[in-house]
Amino acid sequence: MALDTTIAQYEAPEKDLYEVGEMPPMGYVPKQMYAWAIRRERHGDPDTAMLQEVVDVPELDSQDVLVLVMAAGVNYNGVWAALGVPISPFDGHKQPYHIAGSDAAGIVWAVGDRVTRWKVGDEVVIHCNQDDGDDEECNGGDPMYSPSQRIWGYETPDGSFSQFTRVQSQQLMPRPKHLTWEEAACYTLTLATAYRMLFGHEPHDLKPGQNVLVWGASGGLGSYAIQLINTAGANAIGVISDESKRQFVMDLGAKGVLNRKDFNCWGQLPTVNTPEYAIWFTEARKFGKAIWEITGKGVNVDMVFEHPGESTFPVSTFVAKKGGMVVICAGTTGFNLTFDVRYMWMHQKRLQGSHFAHLKQASAANKLMLERRLDPCMSEVFTWADLPEAHMKMMRNQHKPGNMSVLVQAPTTGLRTLEDALEAGR
């Protein structure tokens, strides 16, 4: 195989299986690899559901690319995959094991016969949207509406928690060279998701000067929402649950921060016109007035950036302005959403579901990272052996503000090139 002469040259033996962190010869594909696998009979907490196994390296179709994973990102869909809740990934792909992981930074290691944009040795980040590419939505519409749309590493069995991962060539984007491998691995899923939520739903796409309420402002999604809102010339009002996170969110560019523990209007909406509803309504108005202290008296938010779901949705639909939008991408506190529909129809508010992003949106978000206009907000890095524990921390909401990464083939933190990794691995 002819390799780019700019790629680092090094000697390494050809083997059927390499230890984690051991580098094969450039472009050489072993028969097997290590992976953190989930099996249906092990569904449960991540520390028991995810076990290291030796599995076959996936074979490529003509438009596929094999990527050597240097580092992988940790997201809540890894917790869902382990638990098998709200659905088991095995109900979709029918494979005997599931490799989770929907974020990664790595090196192109092999390409399918029809791949022309990428070559062996290219350093890339991976966005997690896949589709078959052969329907109207994929060709002139919105690929996220395609019947074949699926999330790599959650709805497919071959995610990033392995030494090699198989992806579609359209999933690849250039890796920001100023970031370390672990920083580059942690941002794509949450950043692209936040980008589509804010800019992908016309005519309610974010505009300069608008106000946006951001739940979970110190987390992976929220930290990018705050930065994107600030970059767009709009105003972010962040919501936190721990006072220690206030300065972190302000430093990201928030106009103001609210601590939800100062209010008592969370959970499912009480039945309207009951004493319980009256108590809820008083607290919800108190929360709304706290927003006014940031935006100005009587100025409600143009958009609510929702992802907790059940615990916050009644308030989200209440505080959005007339003609405003509540955009939601998840339900981390529960899926049974309730709200007072009177404030929805009388004030003509929009409820908008949002799911990841298509390539153009993911690429636009990645460009901001390439241009150093965003911070990856990486909070913690875990070793390969501690991957299940990283998911346990996320499940228990014990993780630090920002985004988490796991080292895979990168032997240590702080490395930015293949040469760095080779030197550190000696």
Regions found by a protein language model. Give the residues of each.
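N-terminal Rossmann NAD(P)H-binding glycine-rich loop of SDR-like oxidoreductase domains
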Residues: 218, 226
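Hydrophobic/small residue at the entry helix of a nucleotide-binding pocket
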Residues: 193, 220-221, 311
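NAD(P)H dinucleotide-binding glycine-rich loop of Rossmann-like/cofactor-binding domains
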Residues: 54, 80, 102, 130-216, ...
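C-terminal hydrophobic helical "lid"/dimerization subdomain
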Residues: 2-31, 314-317, 359-426
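Adenosine-nucleotide cofactor-binding segment
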Residues: 214, 230-311
